[in-house]
Amino acid sequence: MRYIVLSFICVMFFVSCGDKNKSKSERFIQDSSGAINNVSVVTENEIWDGRVGEAIRAVLAKPIYGLPQDEPMFTISQIPPAVFSGFVTKNRTVLMVKLNREKGIDFSENVYAKPQKVITVSGKTREEVIEVLQENDAKIRETFRNAEIAERQRQMAKSPHSFESIKEKLKLTVGFPSVYRVAKSTDNFFWIRKDITTGTTNLMIFELPYSAIKRNDSLVNQVIKIRDSVGKLHIEGGVEGSYLATEEAYTPYLAETIIDNKPALETKGIWELRNAFMGGPFINYAIEDKINKRWVVLEGFVFAPSVDKRNYMLEMEAIIKTVKLE
């Protein structure tokens, strides 16, 4: 009996210690912070002012395709290692430069806060660091951008919409916040919009017959023709005879991607209000729903004259990438 009691006390002691250690570690991992699309770069001033700094800016400040004016993918805040402590370590996205180390790159999560992505680029010389940056430029951007999309989705999920009609009519769910309102709806089309200080952010959601898009060399032209016809039918401007269309002077970008584990076409470009003076960027995803023999199209477009549109477009992409098809 004495042995059983002693064993029980030992077990409870270790469990208690484990819980204390767990709670102690959790207290050290605080919530991350920082503005959307802002990356902290931790490196010495002289490195930042030289060729390594130029290479970092070439990776992180690359202009985003599909915006009316050049905007960098990320805003960069350079921080010397000597002052990288306390609150400044809590930024959601951090790039660290380590000299006099083995050449390489490390992708870590939740090092100083959560959620957080920390990328460390190392090299024995500055030239090696530059090589690592250039060899991994796309992966670095993708890692940070995915983190920002996830963060925007997390923020928007705090106040989700409650429009059951989208699920009922289109057999899908999409996670936009409650500040959006339905501007127009039919049996197979929804126009959702949100008022912002300088204009509006907008979403179109609709479905097409499976035969509407054929995978051949004219894919981008097919997508543009469809969006223009849908825009003319459903999105009218304030001026009589004006409607949503694609700006012909700007070549659209098209790429293959995956949305909701299904093949999809991603198209970026500039929209205009035909016969009026309005325009802005759009991002369009046509999802191939083989099970239900249809295409589901979700497009985000922004009207925000005289202000940067990068963060608005990230919100559009973040919303669209929450879609779940039944």
Listing of model-derived features with the role each one plays in the protein:
Residues 30-93:
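N-terminal leader/propeptide segments of preproteins
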Residues 131-153, 180, 294-326:
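Surface-exposed amphipathic alpha-helical segments
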Residues 13-16:
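C-terminal motif of bacterial Sec signal peptides marking the signal peptidase cleavage site
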Residues 22-27, 44-46, 177-236, 244, ...:
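Secretory pathway targeting signatures of secreted, lumenal, and periplasmic proteins
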Residues 1-4, 18-19:
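Positively charged n-region of N-terminal signal peptides that target proteins for export
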Residues 19, 25-34, 49, 58, ...:
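N-terminal "mature-domain start" segment
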